[in-house]
A protein has these predicted regions:
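A short, hydrophobic C-terminal helix/tail in secreted or cell-surface proteins
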Residues: 207-211
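Alpha-helical transmembrane segments in inner-membrane proteins
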Residues: 1-206
Length: 211
């Protein structure tokens, strides 16, 4: 489809402004913290100085956490775009039609039951996949309409939210806290290994969004 020159210019300015904001926030994240670091030393350590006194703080703690935050946001945006394109509704996203809640149910159940946290990513993926299949089946009536799918998804989302609440009320508080922390999300412990994983996910979701 064709886009007018004025809209193209706005998109260019929007992308440029976003990149500038990301760079500024990235630099601020490297400098500011419980242990403030001079801007020149922080930038040098992040880009080329691997033997300085700030190497561990910058390259093992702050830098990977910032990059993980950026990539996670990009993955969320890509997943939202995919859903909106598939359902042809600009208001739809994984959190609205219950996919996020489906992922959270199994993950929260594992945490609350004291299960192995190594299974969390797989449990969340399985929960999201099963929820998507359930929503699709419940929406089927001589085909699937976008409106019916959205309405069913909203209902399933509410139901799964109630299940999560039940789990958090039923189990001991120390386990529930871990589940609540997982739902809220945290950058604590983020590493370059997480960056590689998110890059793979981003490449996949970006390719799917383009299609």
């Amino acid at each position: 489809y064709k886009v007018s020159g004025r809209i193209q210019l706005k998109i260019v300015w929007l992308v440029a402004g976003t990149l500038v904001a990301i760079i500024i926030l990235l630099g601020t994240g490297l400098i500011v913290g419980d242990y403030p670091i001079p801007a020149s030393r922080a930038i040098a350590t992040a880009l080329w100085d691997r033997n300085g006194e700030y190497d561990f703080i910058i390259n093992s703690l702050r830098f990977p956490r910032i990059v993980v935050a950026i990539l996670a946001g990009m993955c969320f945006a890509s997943s939202g775009l995919i859903f909106q394109s598939l359902i042809n509704n600009p208001l739809v996203s994984p959190d609205v039609i219950g996919i996020n809640s489906g992922a959270a149910v199994l993950a929260v159940a594992i945490l609350a039951a004291g299960g192995n946290i190594g299974y969390l990513p797989w449990a969340a993926f399985l929960g999201a996949l099963l929820t998507a299949g359930l929503i699709y089946l419940l929406s089927w009536k001589r085909g699937v309409s976008a409106t019916r799918l959205v309405l069913v998804g909203i209902g399933v989302n509410s139901l799964l939210g109630a299940v999560i609440t039940f789990i958090t009320v039923k189990y001991p508080i120390e386990r529930v806290i871990a589940a609540a922390r997982w739902q809220a999300g945290t950058l604590f412990g983020a590493s370059w290994g997480d960056v590689r994983t998110l890059l793979i996910c981003l490449l996949y979701t970006s390719d799917a969004a383009d299609e």
